[in-house]
Amino acid sequence: FFNFYAPLSIYVTAVFRFLGFSYVQSIQLAQLAGFVVAAWGAFALARRWFGSSWAGLLTAVAYTTAPFHMVNVYMRGDSLAEFWAMAFYPLVLLAADGVWSRSWRGMALLALAYAGLILSHNISALIFSPFLLLYLFLLFLQRSSSSSTPAVNRSQFTARSAAALVLAFALAAFFFVPALAEKGWAQLGPVTEGYFHFSNHFRSLDLVQTTAVFDYSVDEGQAFAMGLVQAVTAVAGIAAILFFLLPRRKETEAEKEGTVAFSRLLFILVTFAVATFMITPWSRPLWEHVPLLAFTQFPWRFLSVQAL
């Protein structure tokens, strides 16, 4: 079991157990710690991206109280690993920023954060990895378009980013290498068949709940959707980006800061659009043909990325 199930959330729980807490208390404290890490990561990321502590606070509240975040704790019960993976999403992006500005220290932080994501929940790491690569690519692209950015720095950014990802896989190898080596002795077929086949869990017109108060009932997967308040907030944020932030974006005194700000806004728009698309039946061709994606099982797992 431990060769196939990401162990980090179990390690966190074990720490509290070793400190003398009961099993139930240890799980509850691990959940509390996950909330704290997620909130801090979202706050730090938004403050860095938008330069405002108020933006950080608003983002931390929105991310921490996102319906899918709550569902993983209070409804699914067995999703402590996936819950902890959401805590690492903002940390990974925050560390990715540091690859450019903090040299080798930034590379080490990205390696640690990404390894933490892999060890938290391998399926969530699979889901989030394309978005991480997109963000790194946008950073490189925008830096490359800046005449004030030396080419040697762009080369170093690429090398450090690649090295950080390789180091992250090396740090997490003790978990996923045995899992890959022993997959022949595990019955992996049933995890993508029957109830667990992705085609049974798409969301279309029911992607967003219609009541102001989120309905956490498990009937017909009602809880695996966006909340109405969350959807309205997301639409308002997208509108602000499209009609206010992007048109009025001005190059700062340091041109590279302006181009990176544009990358972040573009990343937010693309990530939200792609994550939402992957939850709907329109994405079925991708689910059928992209390797390993079927092991995600539930398209609504992209709600975790959408929440960010």
Residue spans for each PLM region:
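Membrane-helix boundary/interfacial segments in multi-pass membrane proteins
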Residues: 69-84, 190-225, 274-308
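Membrane-interface helix-loop-helix junctions at transmembrane boundaries of multi-pass membrane enzymes
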Residues: 143-161, 238-276, 281-285
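Periplasmic/ER-lumenal interhelical loops and adjacent helix-loop junctions
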Residues: 164-248
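Membrane-water interface of alpha-helical transmembrane segments
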Residues: 24, 28-31, 50-53, 104, ...
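Membrane-embedded helix bundles of polyisoprenyl
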Residues: 2, 17, 29-49, 53-140, ...
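Membrane-proximal lumenal/periplasmic loop motifs of glycosylation machinery
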Residues: 1-7
